[in-house]
Design a protein with these regions (language model features):
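Catalytic nucleophile-elbow at a beta strand-turn-alpha helix junction centered on a G-D-S/GDSL motif
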Residues: 10-27, 61-65
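Alpha-helical cap/lid subdomain in secreted, periplasmic
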Residues: 6-9, 32-139
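A short, compositionally biased domain-edge/stem linker segment
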Residues: 1-4
Length: 139
């Protein structure tokens, strides 16, 4: 995917998650959220045209766990198959704290993404609570 970016080929970078992806705590949230800042950093570092050929999709909804992420992946990211992202950054770890499936839904979401015909790259983002705890080991 990095070579695709460097070559100036059309590339789609998508972010799927909860309130952290939505931009909670960032002011203004649309410009200062981690998703936008990450997209801009990737474009600046890896593209010859500062991202003119890179599509940005942000699908963050506060309070949602990965169970809803599976549905939102189809609806908000791939738009029911019309879009094939090349990179998807997934952040649900905070909202999956009460996950009764012990990570099976999270795994199902990642498997669904990996099963796409274009085999997108996936980054799993695990936010850390103030006490340095996160769900990485549970998922």
């Amino acid at each position: 995917m990095l070579q695709q970016l460097r070559d100036g080929k059309p590339t789609t970078i998508a972010f799927l998650g909860g309130s952290i992806t939505q931009g909670a705590g960032a002011v203004p949230s649309q410009e200062m959220c981690y998703a936008r800042k990450t997209y801009e950093a990737i474009c600046e570092r890896y593209t010859p045209d500062h991202g003119a050929h890179v599509r940005y999709i942000k699908a963050g909804v506060g309070g949602t766990p990965c169970q809803l992420g599976i549905i939102r992946y189809d609806r908000d990211i791939t738009r029911d198959g019309a879009v094939q992202p090349d990179l998807i950054i997934v952040e649900f770890a905070v909202n999956d704290e009460a996950d009764e499936t012990k990570g099976l839904m999270h795994e199902s979401l990642i498997q669904k993404i990996w099963s796409a015909p274009n085999e997108p790259a996936v980054v799993m983002l695990f936010s850390v609570f103030a006490n340095d705890w996160n769900l990485k080991d549970r998922l």
